[in-house]
Amino acid sequence: MGCFGYLLLIIGLHQVLATYPIWWSLAVGQQYSSLGTQPIPCGTIPGLVAKQMRFCRNYMEIMPSVAEGVKIGIQECQHQFRGRRWNCTTVNDNLAIFGPVLDKATRESAFVHAIASAGVAFAVTRSCAEGSATICGCDTHHKGPPGEGWKWGGCSEDMDFGSMVSREFADARENRPDARSAMNRHNNEAGRTSILDHRHLKCKCHGLSGSCEVKTCWWSQPDFRVIGDYLKDKYDSASEMVVEKHRESRGWVETLRPKYTFFKPPIERDLIYYESSPNFCEPNPETGSFGTRDRECNVTSHGIDGCDLLCCGRGQNTRTEKRKEKCHCIFHWCCYVSCQECMRVYDVHTCK
């Protein structure tokens, strides 16, 4: 990112950090990447509120999974938005890892909160099933009798425990009576719910000579790409809300209601937002936009990844690029494939 990345952090930093989940820096911090499955000292994690600090100390052995969950959430965000004007760019080695871009209550902020919350639930659940933590394990509450021709067996992944960890930790700082906290809580829960909604049975056959005399089944999480695809669809159809203020015994409270009453109101699985997104065409330190100059675009696409839209009408530059690829592959009996290496020339298009 260079100097511009640091400039993004400086502009409006005070406002950003007031509501920013700074603990997301666990996902990119150099000091945590080398720890592997070793416990993370709670005092070294920036931005924890008191409830998060207590949780960290009580469940220290699963904190590496929390960090891993945020990391896979960010990686999935970058995959889902790889062809869009905002591509989930992070500002490494800074507390506000996305810069000011998430300071606004936009669709992008809704997606990032949902995918990060889902990532934490996913990683903790996986860690428990793999036996990496002593405080959790397989789910023994199978939620229903077995079906015809199979019985419960194996290790059902305890998705309820993973969701609990995500809820207790990620939502701990979202306790303010304002609209942004309400939005973040809703989108965090939408992310967690997506995992439970996409769980599925995995089964294994047992018997002589490959027969399936006995079949054992267990609950399994979906592949995280399934969650990313699903939440990306929810991003595209996110519900716009408006902020309402009313007075309660504890003071002024902000709540959210749908902006358009003729649409179906959002449910817990939907993403919500209440501020418009910038167009992300040009660099803007105040909004956190890096612009799209020099971004690679698809000259044949009419979608958002196409040069017309991604480059915001500025046009594109074209250069040729040589790439080594495997070619003339031959299957040999038995059993391997040999290939030659060919040099091929491609046109690469980047935004002006």
Swiss-Prot record:
Residues 1-18 form the signal peptide. GO terms for biological process: canonical Wnt signaling pathway; cell fate commitment; neural crest cell differentiation; neuron differentiation; positive regulation of transcription by RNA polymerase II; Wnt signaling pathway. At neurula in anterior neural fold; at tailbud in dorsal midline of midbrain. Disulfide bonds have critical and distinct roles in secretion and activity. Loss of each conserved cysteine results in high molecular weight oxidized Wnt oligomers, which are formed through inter-Wnt disulfide bonding. GO terms for cellular component: extracellular space. Keywords: Developmental protein, Disulfide bond, Extracellular matrix, Glycoprotein, Lipoprotein, Secreted, Signal, Wnt signaling pathway. InterPro entries: Wnt, Wnt3, Wnt_C, Wnt_CS. Disulfide bonds join C77-C88, C128-C136, C138-C155, C203-C217, C205-C212, C297-C312, C327-C342, C329-C339, C334-C335. Glycans are attached at N87, N298. A lipid is attached at S209 (O-palmitoleoyl serine). GO terms for molecular function: cytokine activity; frizzled binding. It is found in: Secreted, Extracellular space, Extracellular matrix; Secreted. PROSITE patterns: WNT1 (PS00246). It comes from the Eukaryota. Pfam families: wnt. CDD domains: Wnt_Wnt3_Wnt3a. Ligand for members of the frizzled family of seven transmembrane receptors. Functions in the canonical Wnt signaling pathway that results in activation of transcription factors of the TCF/LEF family. Required for normal embryonic mesoderm development and formation of caudal somites. Required for normal morphogenesis of the developing neural tube. PANTHER family: PROTEIN WNT-3A (PTHR12027:SF88), WNT RELATED (PTHR12027). Belongs to the Wnt family. This is Protein Wnt-3a. It comes from Xenopus laevis (African clawed frog). The gene is wnt3a.
